[in-house]
């Protein structure tokens, strides 16, 4: 009987933790996310979007800058012609404070999945016409150090997203030309 109660208690505890998976944020303070960031991990619904340095959506976000109109300027680096190029993406605010419209390759939406503002930001890009087929997310950190607890939180945050999202291995151990 004691084992049954213990098993029931553990099942309830696991169930409570499973329901604590972050969804798209309801609010985002642009002034708090402003500043320098490092791409620590990437994930995609189609791994070919990230599987090589020259893959179309393998970009390294460097900085986020809010504009006076509450839009967001995203400064990133990407592989281009055996080198690295800095790009700027203008992200226009939408009715949702954590979601922005963009025009970058086939992607049209950027959204914040979760952040604590000081240590990490989970940022995703998707194509609204094919949300399960073209979704890329990044675990951004204020430093280049990987926090295993936050990495696990990133994995859990990706689980409810549409499609089968695959994570690219730890980017901090790779010597890629565009990674700073």
Curated annotation (Swiss-Prot):
Monomer. Keywords: Disulfide bond, Milk protein, Retinol-binding, Secreted, Signal, Transport. It comes from Equus caballus. InterPro entries: Blactoglobulin, Calycin, Lipocalin, Lipocalin_CS, Lipocln_cytosolic_FA-bd_dom. Belongs to the calycin superfamily. Lipocalin family. It is found in: Secreted. Lactoglobulin is the primary component of whey, it binds retinol and is probably involved in the transport of that molecule. PROSITE patterns: LIPOCALIN. PANTHER family: GLYCODELIN (PTHR11430:SF117), LIPOCALIN (PTHR11430). One of its GO terms (cellular component) is extracellular region. This is Beta-lactoglobulin-1. Residues 1-18 form the signal peptide. Pfam families: Lipocalin (PF00061). Gene3D superfamilies: 2.40.128.20. Its main location: secreted. GO terms for molecular function: retinol binding. Disulfide bonds join 84-178, 124-137.
């Amino acid at each position: 009987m004691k084992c049954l109660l213990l098993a029931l208690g553990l099942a309830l505890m696991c169930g409570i933790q499973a329901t604590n998976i972050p969804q798209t944020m309801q609010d985002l303070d642009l002034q708090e996310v402003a500043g320098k960031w490092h791409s620590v991990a990437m994930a995609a619904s189609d791994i070919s979007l990230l599987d090589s340095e020259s893959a179309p959506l393998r970009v390294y976000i460097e900085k986020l800058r809010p504009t006076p109109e509450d839009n967001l300027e995203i400064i990133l680096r990407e592989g281009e012609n055996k080198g690295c190029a800095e790009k700027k993406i203008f992200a226009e605010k939408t009715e949702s404070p954590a979601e922005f419209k963009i025009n970058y390759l086939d992607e049209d939406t950027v959204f914040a999945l979760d952040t604590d503002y000081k240590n990490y930001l989970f940022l995703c890009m998707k194509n609204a016409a094919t949300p399960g087929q073209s979704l890329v997310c990044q675990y951004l950190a204020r430093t280049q150090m990987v926090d295993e607890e936050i990495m696990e939180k990133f994995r859990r945050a990706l689980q409810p997203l549409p499609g089968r999202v695959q994570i690219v291995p730890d980017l901090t151990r790779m010597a890629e030309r565009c990674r700073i």
